């Protein structure tokens, strides 16, 4: 066989190998898409690396907020949060969650994280995976016209992973029923460390519920 007879064969082999790689790549992409869709359908949050921002503005503090599932929409809960002014953490640029008042006098603030309630003595309750909780960070909230110290926030209902809340008064039984505003354990630790550093605190004000508190 002459040398030139090999050229089509080599070309065919190269095209075949390239085609196999393309099919494998498409299968990998399809698998990732299916995993994301399945996670969303099951109510799971796909982890993403969030950047912390240090803000000073009015905000809603939901670290211990009680929440009630929204009628007709089990994926959302309505939470009653405190309106605060001062340093806080968010995972979007501060201007994105800047408070505002519309032409009708309706005041909008956003749920952001702060250490204030822990400094006031609230302790951190850890709850097991599978129990319902709400994720309020960065969510828009409407300030109560009858009580400007309170805001109503619409938060996501989740049942993923171990989570914490400053609500519940250390009563673990409420983890299954109360729909507390909470946070994933790792995110809470990361946010706490960030604020301690930004505020130049000597130590964190966070205290945890003890085994003796369980009931």
Give each language-model segment a name:
Residues 28-29:
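Bacterial Sec-dependent N-terminal signal peptides
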Residues 44-50:
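Sec/Tat signal peptide C-region and signal peptidase I cleavage site
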Residues 1-25:
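Short hydrophobic alpha-helices and adjacent helix-cap/hinge residues
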Residues 50-215:
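Mitochondrial intermembrane space
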């Amino acid at each position: 066989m002459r040398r030139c007879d090999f050229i089509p064969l080599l070309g065919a082999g190269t095209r075949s190998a390239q085609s196999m790689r393309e099919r494998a790549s498409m299968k990998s992409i399809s698998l990732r898409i299916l995993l994301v869709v399945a996670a969303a359908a099951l109510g799971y949050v796909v982890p993403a690396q969030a950047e912390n921002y240090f803000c000073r503005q009015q905000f809603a503090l939901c670290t211990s907020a009680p929440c009630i599932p929204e009628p007709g929409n089990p994926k959302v809960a309505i939470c009653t949060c405190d309106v605060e002014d001062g340093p806080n953490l968010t995972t979007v640029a501060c201007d994105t969650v800047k408070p505002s008042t519309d032409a009708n006098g309706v005041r909008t603030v956003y749920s952001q994280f702060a250490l204030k309630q822990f400094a006031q003595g609230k302790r951190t309750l850890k709850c097991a995976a599978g129990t319902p909780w709400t994720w309020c960070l960065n969510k828009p909230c409407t300030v109560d016209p009858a009580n400007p110290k309170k805001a109503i926030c619409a938060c996501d209902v989740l049942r993923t992973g171990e989570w914490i809340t400053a609500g519940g008064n250390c009563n673990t039984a409420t983890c299954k029923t109360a729909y507390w505003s909470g946070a994933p354990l790792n995110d809470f630790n990361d946010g706490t460390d960030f604020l301690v550093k930004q505020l130049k605190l000597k130590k964190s004000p966070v205290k945890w519920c003890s085994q003796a508190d369980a009931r």
